[in-house]
Amino acid sequence: DVLGSRGLGDVYKRQAYISSKHAMSPTTAVLQAVREMERMAQMAETNLIRAMNTLVTRDQKEIDEVYRVEENINFLNKEITNYLVHLNQASLPTSDVMRIGALFHVVNDIERIGDHAENVADSAVQMTNDNVTFSKQGELDLSEMLDMVLKILDESIEMFAKNDLQHLQEIIDIENSIDQEERDLQQKHVERLTRNECTPEAGMIFSDLVSGLERVADHATNIAFSILDEDPEEKAAREAVAGAEK
């Protein structure tokens, strides 16, 4: 059994779409940076799936691959950021300047998602070393939450790449569902501990994984909202104040 079943293609360290050696118009360069960001996001998403699967398979080769890909993601983070800094020095239309500003934030969020995949692999190593296992229900719960997180991540990346706000409300709804799912799973895991149905160590790792997945969803939401050049938490706070004043 595995927790995620999407294809896990190979990845390469070298950037595919951006290069300071090839001259292109600034607007084309911005589009290429977006394509490189999409590639980096696919790497991070695939690596998260790979890492989650190692919780079940304990496959050391796959765990090693998670760490290798994380290095690639960090490499791309630096390369794209440097490229954007270089682009920012050109004379650009306001729309491109805003797009570059948003890309800085998006690339950082993707890098943070990559960090969570590495944390999951660390948990798989800990579970292997300490002979810790989850119940079948625990595995199912993680798999279902992972599916929700992948959905919001896919939609957010697509939204940003297309610069399309059409599905923003759907992103907000999925994010709210994931927040509720995290609360429900944390409560269920406390109940399992109380009934002695799982060990304290398994419970602690499970709790960390659920919290980590919720934070991945937060980063995905940030990516969607970056189109507006607005932080989702700041927006929620502003709307709450506006609602209270009505």
What does each model-identified segment do?
Residues S5-K246:
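Cytosolic, long alpha-helical scaffolding segments
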